[in-house]
């Protein structure tokens, strides 16, 4: 798949896959940002893109940032719809107790292109029964002692 990219900032980098088997590509910051402890910050990527109809770009946390700095994409995965033409920006959350400094060119998130599907919603009076029923939030992962 070919994705058209428009650089709108002089520091913008065209995304690339780091290895043959990578499903995600790095997204790079175009400006310095300091995110205070237990706060969020918006990081500009400096590119706009055009995806084919039926696809989205998911913006995801880089595992190294999460493990080593306790920094994550707040709305992970963030969704960039195929009809969006504005600048890609990433909401980062700093869960640590110290400032997190983003430098120009830092790899701050990863993008993954995913196929999307349009559902048809059908109203009904009652849903089919399942063994889970209406159990939610932890209902299948914790043993009851």
Curated annotation (Swiss-Prot):
Entry EC no(s): 3.6.1.23
Gene that specifies this protein: dut
Protein name: Deoxyuridine 5'-triphosphate nucleotidohydrolase
Enzyme class: hydrolase
Keyword Magnesium: yes
Cofactor: Mg(2+)
Domain of life: Bacteria
Similarity remark: Belongs to the dUTPase family.
Organism expressing this protein natively: Helicobacter pylori (strain P12)
SUPFAM superfamilies to which the protein is assigned, alphabetical: dUTPase-like (SSF51283)
Disulfide bonds: none
Pathway the protein takes part in: Pyrimidine metabolism; dUMP biosynthesis; dUMP from dCTP (dUTP route): step 2/2
UniProt keyword Nucleus, yes or no: no
Binding-site list for substrate: 62-64, 75, 79-81, 89
General function of this protein: This enzyme is involved in nucleotide metabolism: it produces dUMP, the immediate precursor of thymidine nucleotides and it decreases the intracellular concentration of dUTP so that uracil cannot be incorporated into DNA.
Enzymatic reactions: dUTP + H2O = dUMP + diphosphate + H(+)
Keyword vocabulary terms for this entry: Hydrolase, Magnesium, Metal-binding, Nucleotide metabolism
GO molecular function annotation: dUTP diphosphatase activity; magnesium ion binding
One GO-annotated biological process of the protein: dUMP biosynthetic process
